[in-house]
């Protein structure tokens, strides 16, 4: 995918016949018929189309996030064509400008919705036939008996959940569902303290309409009657949240960060997370706030478009594990029923759903710790959308880090080994074995098999 905000402009001269000969203005409906005549019939049903309420004056500036385009030097109807309504923004889309008198058509390819005039300033002239229940409320899950032995106390676990939404026209209810699901997972499956979970969503605690369904996001994410959404999704609120955590967390604490909704990138390819009022929070700004937090480990899961572009900003932080729904230049998508986003749904399922064995479905080695790498791998293999999930952590961190802390070590330090003795070891530190000289050592590695091991043998007297 080329990193261009809009790729090419096509100019088509159409004959409007009697309309032009009579020098009559083209009506909105006539302009719409021109638009749909140029859309492939196989994709028309799933396409949604918006049109400006009035004819745009010549040379009107149309803002598209941080970029802009300009209408022709004559009056025109502006149409916005979204062929992929189940994908998050940004993704491939078209702007069509139909000359109100001459019938000339300008087609501009882009990857983001208009922010001025916004979709709220336009009329949806055609809806997609893709239907789903946008208003599904995720019911509270029954609190299960915890399987794992906690590696840390609940007071050492913190989380930040962020869903920017963009604006009411593109703040789809599935983002609320995604956040509600992970919030309940943290609270009821992993025993996080609600006071340690910061929820930053759309317009925060405002009662104004903030969703595409024409309602206000419920503030209660788990149905217990208590408001859980605390702050509006602005860069200032996010910066303040991470600043507070940087002054509070210590090397004994764990931080989980979850982001969802839309994403974008600038002309330099710098990925961003779309916040409320279409504000862009770029990876180059976001990462230093997170990297300033001195936690034992930070587990990041991102579901927005172009989320893979955040990874490079964390590669110098050995305490960070990050999983993303897509690469730095790919959109991300919802599930086919539109109620959740594909990647984050399966990531959450990996750490929440129990298999017949009694362990979580993502817990491959059944050690009661569904690690960040196991959850990512489960989500990646179950993700059937046109997206390529990404993952990174240094020093094997994600093979040990889980929502319930760090996978427990069975032993560490110096170990005296007698002839024929065996032991199990799980950990990341260097260990020392003391054995009699000329004794054979048989090493059997059962799990995991995809890790690099280093061995060093030397002789000496016990100290």
Feature locations, PLM:
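A short, surface-exposed interaction/processing loop segment used at functional sites
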Residues: 94-140
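Active-site-proximal C-terminal subdomain of hydrolase catalytic domains
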Residues: 180, 298-393
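Aromatic/hydrophobic beta-strand junction motif of beta-rich domains
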Residues: 186, 425-435
């Amino acid at each position: 995918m080329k990193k261009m905000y809009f790729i090419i402009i096509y100019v088509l001269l159409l004959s409007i016949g009697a309309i032009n000969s009579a020098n009559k203005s083209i009506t909105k409906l006539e302009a719409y018929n021109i638009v749909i005549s140029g859309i492939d019939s196989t994709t028309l049903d799933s396409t949604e189309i918006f049109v400006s309420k009035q004819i745009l004056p010549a040379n009107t500036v149309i803002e598209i996030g941080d970029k802009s385009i300009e209408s022709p030097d004559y009056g025109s109807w502006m149409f916005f064509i979204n062929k992929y309504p189940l994908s998050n923004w940004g993704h491939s889309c078209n702007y069509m400008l139909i000359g109100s008198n001459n019938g000339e058509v300008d087609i501009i390819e882009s990857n983001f919705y208009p922010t001025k005039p916004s979709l709220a300033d336009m009329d949806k002239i055609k809806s997609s036939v893709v239907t789903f229940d946008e208003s599904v409320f995720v019911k509270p899950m029954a609190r299960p008996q915890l399987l794992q032995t906690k590696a840390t106390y609940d007071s050492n676990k913190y989380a930040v959940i962020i869903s920017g939404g963009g604006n009411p026209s593109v703040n789809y209810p599935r983002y609320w569902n995604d956040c509600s699901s992970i919030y309940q997972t943290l609270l009821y499956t992993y025993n996080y303290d609600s006071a340690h979970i910061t929820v930053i969503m759309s317009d925060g605690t405002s009662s104004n309409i903030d969703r595409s369904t024409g309602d206000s996001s419920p503030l209660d994410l788990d149905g217990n009657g208590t408001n859980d959404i605390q702050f509006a999704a602005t860069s200032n609120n996010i910066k303040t949240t991470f600043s507070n955590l940087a002054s509070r967390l210590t090397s004994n604490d764990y931080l989980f960060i979850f982001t969802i909704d839309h994403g974008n990138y600038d002309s330099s390819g710098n990925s961003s997370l779309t916040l409320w009022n279409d504000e862009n929070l770029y990876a180059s700004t976001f990462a230093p706030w997170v990297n300033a937090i001195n936690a034992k480990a930070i587990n990041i899961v991102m579901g927005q478009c172009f989320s893979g572009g955040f990874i490079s900003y964390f590669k110098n932080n050995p305490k960070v594990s990050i999983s993303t729904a897509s690469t730095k230049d790919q959109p991300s998508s919802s599930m086919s029923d539109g109620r959740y986003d594909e990647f984050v749904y399966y990531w959450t399922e990996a750490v929440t759903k129990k298999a017949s064995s009694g362990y979580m479905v993502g817990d491959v080695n059944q050690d009661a710790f569904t690690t960040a790498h196991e959850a990512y791998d489960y989500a990646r293999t179950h993700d059937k959308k046109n997206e390529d999930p990404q993952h990174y952590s240094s020093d094997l961190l994600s093979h040990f880090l889980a929502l319930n802390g760090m996978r427990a070590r069975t032993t560490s330090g110096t170990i005296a080994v007698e002839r024929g003795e065996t032991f199990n070891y799980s950990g990341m530190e260097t260990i020392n074995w003391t054995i009699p000289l000329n004794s054979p050592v048989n090493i059997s590695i059962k799990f995991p098999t995809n890790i690099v091991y280093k061995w060093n043998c030397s002789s000496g007297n016990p100290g």
